[in-house]
């Protein structure tokens, strides 16, 4: 199969040149500065599996017309001595040989999957020099169990968040079925208010809804401050110590059936996110029960079917995209018509999301619990508050006062991916698996959809969580168990 360069989408006018960009010479935004702090010096890793071998020269040629059109991918971050040493964007000449790495695989490797896994883990031990734009791309022509080749994109989080990088990635892709067309993202249709009920009753309902949002926000803000100063999660085998942000990571991923997730979603009248949180609660409960059972066994105590301590407090720093247009547009072609039109940045807030840990008699209670908590977290301005507070503290007190919470057990995030099979620079994509390293937690769980698959990515500090593959097994088994119960109870149409 021949590999062709990406075909551009025709637009009414070309994107502005870099000289007219507002990035050059500007200081880094408060959120970008936050990602340079020692306990939040975060890098985004995107592992992309391909159905064909990679052609490095074709990819380099296309990067010139895509990534390098993005100001942040062709800028270095330098200290502005005239402004107290604050970092600012300065344009630089980009030598792609400094950014695109094509290693020669060991011909005697025992396992291609383990080779790629170790390669990514070794990347997490390094940082990108600030003397060049802070991104690189590693092309591994290694056949693994689920791909013919693997690309690994590494980007410092100061360049942009997961949602904006997903837009940039999608601007570099085309539908496999139609090479002239951009792919589409799933989007949420907001329910229209029922106009049949009006008058005083509707006014009262609206007023109560507004009151509820502000009340929930007040409660969440109080909980945020309590957490910041002294409320830590329970010290479980999944909870990392202080300083874990600087440790290397083991990154693994597993593919789940998106159709199975949708089956549970429809049966429980829930959302995809509710189901993902529910199966994660179930999986972490199984995992911790096993670990506590081993602790009891090692101590010579009797091991039962339920070894979990009571009242485990386990919370996730759950990241929320604050770009409202991503949830409102079905056709994103205008947003990603070219790579230069994608607006990179860190428009993210977060909520402190409690996970209910315990062994349930009815596994569907995991979904019900996740649904109830998710509904509660939607009726709050907590994510906007954490975003604005971070900006405020960074602006007036410095980034050291606005670090991400270390009191939670894990980071949790999900990003919707393309609904159709796509090609990237002419190479058919098999999967997309984004995650991070440098975060102040020992465990991160990320989910991203692609066509009819849901990819789960686990990033762990092996010194704290030595069994990331077992967590993947637990997630897979939890989804299977919940799906089977849904079918057995006749909840499927």
PLM features: residue spans?
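Soluble acyl-CoA-dependent acyltransferase catalytic core bearing the H(X)4D motif
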Residues: 2-26, 36, 45-441, 445-476, ...
């Amino acid at each position: 199969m021949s590999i062709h360069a990406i075909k551009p989408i025709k637009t009414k006018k070309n994107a502005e040149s870099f000289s007219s960009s507002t990035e050059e010479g500007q200081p880094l935004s408060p959120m970008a500065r936050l990602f340079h702090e020692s306990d939040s010096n975060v890098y985004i890793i995107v592992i992309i599996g391909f159905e064909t071998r990679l052609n490095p020269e074709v990819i380099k040629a296309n990067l010139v017309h895509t990534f390098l059109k993005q100001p942040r991918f062709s800028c270095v971050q330098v200290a502005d001595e005239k402004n107290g040493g604050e970092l600012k964007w300065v344009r630089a000449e980009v030598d792609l040989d400094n950014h695109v790495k094509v290693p020669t695989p060991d011909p005697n490797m025992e396992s291609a999957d383990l080779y790629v896994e170790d390669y990514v883990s070794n990347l997490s031990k390094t940082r990108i020099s600030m003397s060049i734009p802070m991104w690189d791309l590693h092309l591994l022509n290694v056949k693994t169990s689920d791909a013919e080749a693997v690309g690994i994109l590494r980007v410092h989080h100061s360049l942009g968040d997961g949602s904006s990088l997903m837009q940039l990635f999608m601007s570099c892709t085309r539908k496999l079925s139609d090479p002239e067309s951009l792919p589409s993202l799933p989007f949420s249709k907001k329910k229209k208010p029922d106009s049949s009920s009006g008058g005083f009753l509707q006014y009262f309902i609206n007023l109560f809804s507004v009151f509820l949002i502000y009340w929930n926000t007040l409660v969440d803000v109080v909980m945020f401050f309590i957490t910041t100063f002294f409320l830590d999660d329970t010290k479980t085998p999944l909870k990392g110590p202080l300083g874990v942000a600087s440790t290397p990571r083991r990154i693994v991923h597993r593919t789940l059936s998106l159709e199975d997730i949708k089956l549970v979603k429809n049966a429980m009248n829930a959302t995809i996110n509710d189901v993902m949180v529910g199966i994660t609660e179930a999986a972490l409960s199984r995992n911790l029960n096993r670990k506590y059972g081993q602790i009891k066994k090692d101590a010579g105590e009797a091991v039962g079917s339920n070894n979990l301590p009571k009242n485990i407090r386990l919370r996730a720093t759950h990241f929320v995209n604050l770009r409202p247009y991503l949830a409102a547009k079905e056709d994103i072609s205008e947003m990603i018509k070219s790579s230069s039109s994608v607006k990179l940045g860190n428009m993210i807030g977060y909520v402190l999301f409690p996970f209910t840990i315990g062994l349930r008699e009815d596994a569907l209670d995991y979904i019900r619990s996740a649904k109830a908590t998710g509904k509660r977290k939607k009726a709050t301005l907590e994510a906007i508050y954490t975003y604005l507070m971070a900006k405020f503290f960074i602006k007036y007190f410095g980034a050291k006062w606005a670090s991400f919470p270390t009191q939670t057990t894990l980071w949790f995030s999900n990003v919707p991916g393309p609904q159709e099979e796509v090609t990237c620079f002419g190479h058919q994509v098999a999967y997309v698996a984004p995650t991070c390293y440098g975060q102040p937690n020992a465990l991160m769980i990320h989910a991203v959809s692609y066509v009819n698959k849901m990819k789960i990515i686990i990033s762990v500090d092996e010194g704290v969580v030595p069994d990331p593959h077992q967590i993947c097994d637990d997630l897979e088994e939890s989804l299977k168990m919940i799906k089977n119960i849904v079918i057995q109870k006749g909840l499927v149409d």
